[in-house]
């Protein structure tokens, strides 16, 4: 798992971006959050752990959890 910080997240739209420890930005969609976070969403500045899914539009954060 990678570590990073939530750069921005719009709960009303269900997506945002995480900046990884490697300074790369990863798109995150509500579908990539662990179940307990789907209702709550994410907040800018939160430290998170995540896996990366390589997609046609770029890398995407999945299995996102706090910590």
List where the protein language model places each region:
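Short aromatic-glycine-enriched beta-strand elements
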Residues: 13-18
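OB-fold/S1-family single-stranded nucleic acid-binding modules
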Residues: 53-67
């Amino acid at each position: 798992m990678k570590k990073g910080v939530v750069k921005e997240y719009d709960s009303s739209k269900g997506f945002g971006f995480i900046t990884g420890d490697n300074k790369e930005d990863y798109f995150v969609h509500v579908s990539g959050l662990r179940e307990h976070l789907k209702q709550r969403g994410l907040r800018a500045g939160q430290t998170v752990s995540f896996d990366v899914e390589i997609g046609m539009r770029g890398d995407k954060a999945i299995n996102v959890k706090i910590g």
